[in-house]
Regions:
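Positively charged, polar, low-complexity stretches
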Residues: 1-132
Length: 132
């Protein structure tokens, strides 16, 4: 199996097993955003605030999220974002899902244009805890 970090970032990819260990060997910084309990846009922005270690000054909107993901002073040159429960989030949120994807892919393209790498790694929980 090819290590995801041996290739340039290519959209939203399935997270490898033990992404932090693999990333460390390739000098890639990793942060994790847990989308499992997100119910609305405010919850989504709070998940990114926590996952990225942002301050309360984070604007909690799409433009602010794009800006923090593309800020060369705030993000390392080689950076991976692990999106926990991404597939389930997309299935649950028919409007928020595509909006988030657009911001993430736009930030990834901007990073690449600046000679930087932003991996977007979708990771699903090991067990199904959803209650319908």
């Amino acid at each position: 199996m090819i290590n995801v970090f041996q290739q340039p970032p290519q959209g939203i990819q399935t997270a490898p097993h033990e992404p932090r260990i693999l990333a460390a060997g390739h000098q890639v910084a990793v942060r994790e955003v847990d989308l499992e309990g997100v119910a609305d846009k405010e919850g989504l922005m709070l998940a990114f605030l926590r996952g990225l270690g942002l301050t309360d000054h984070f604007g909690r909107n799409w433009d602010a999220l794009y800006d923090v993901l593309t800020d060369p002073d705030a993000r390392p040159v080689r950076f991976a974002l692990v999106l926990r429960d991404y597939g389930h989030f997309q299935a649950r949120h028919k409007q928020l899902g595509p909006q988030l994807q657009q911001v993430l892919l736009g930030a990834q393209a901007e990073a690449a244009a600046r000679g930087r790498s932003l991996w977007l790694l979708a990771e699903e929980p090991d067990h199904d805890t959803r209650h319908w």
